[in-house]
Amino acid sequence: MALLKVKFDQKKRVKLAQGLWLMNWFSVLAGIIIFSLGLFLKIELRKRSDVMNNSESHFVPNSLIGMGVLSCVFNSLAGKICYDALDPAKYARWKPWLKPYLAICVLFNIILFLVALCCFLLRGSLENTLGQGLKNGMKYYRDTDTPGRCFMKKTIDMLQIEFKCCGNNGFRDWFEIQWISNRYLDFSSKEVKDRIKSNVDGRYLVDGVPFSCCNPSSPRPCIQYQITNNSAHYSYDHQTEELNLWVRGCRAALLSYYSSLMNSMGVVTLLIWLFEVTITIGLRYLQTSLDGVSNPEESESESQGWLLERSVPETWKAFLESVKKLGKGNQVEAEGADAGQAPEAG
């Protein structure tokens, strides 16, 4: 028994075809929106590629760009099908291709739904990518004379200023790395020698941070050196006083920014997915109602349209049987090919 059967007359079929034609062209615009969102996200990720550890984070924007292009192609084609649907001669040319086309549309909708889910689920992967990338970027901060790394200082400084953050997880991350180049250290100074000797790796570590960590909204002049030394500054206690540095780490700041972007894109993609599913259902009803017309020349006759020819369990069973037959057919072909090669080998 057909699932969700609906009776159509000529007037209803015309309205359905016209409505679907209009919806498909709206969906082309939606495809352009998906493409634009993917392109925008890719550009935003590229801007911070120096502080990202790998290219895995580009899966979502690349997927959005691809799905946007496919949406424009499929919906343009569907619009043409709907336009030709009520002309018996033109519809006859499309008829053999409609079932495979609808199957492709179903597959497209499944993939689009998965891409929308990925927009919400990529946070964990992005967090690890940003964490390792920022750690490496901070390590190369001092390499202003090294080719290929000389830009890293400016990149990190601009990042901390723009996102109002400091370090990877916080300002104390700067205490654990040498962020001042040896070029600007006076090795004849006793203080410099003592600091380097006191470190196992021979690094010059200080309880200080780059200028870009300073919060300009603070009324007090920025304390960026000897941050944990209360006696080095007048009326100062680093444990109780609100420091005039950005407290939030850059990983959290960037993660929040990209997560909000991808969550918004995920919502938009889900809404477009619902629209695409509606169009696919409408196309199925249009196809079955037109196929149900006994005589194409008598366009006024009534017909029935349905979503599935049989119930869901029966449809699923038939699908599994067709897959099994396909598998057996491939196996027989492979055995025949092996049998044909055996005499030649002899």
Curated annotation (Swiss-Prot):
Residues 341-346 are annotated as: Interaction with MREG. Pfam families: Tetraspanin (PF00335). Changing residue 244 to K: In RP7; with bulls-eye maculopathy. Changing residue 214 to S: In RP7; decreased protein expression. Changing residue 185 to P: In RP7; digenic inheritance; results in disease in combination with a null mutation of ROM1. Residues 1-24, 81-99, 291-346 are cytoplasmic. Glycans are attached at residues 53, 229. Retina (photoreceptor). In rim region of ROS (rod outer segment) disks. The keyword Transmembrane applies. Homodimer; disulfide-linked. Forms a homotetramer. Forms a heterotetramer with ROM1. Homotetramer and heterotetramer core complexes go on to form higher order complexes by formation of intermolecular disulfide bonds. Interacts with MREG. Interacts with STX3. Interacts with SNAP25. PANTHER family: PERIPHERIN-2, TETRASPANIN. This is Peripherin-2. It comes from Homo sapiens.
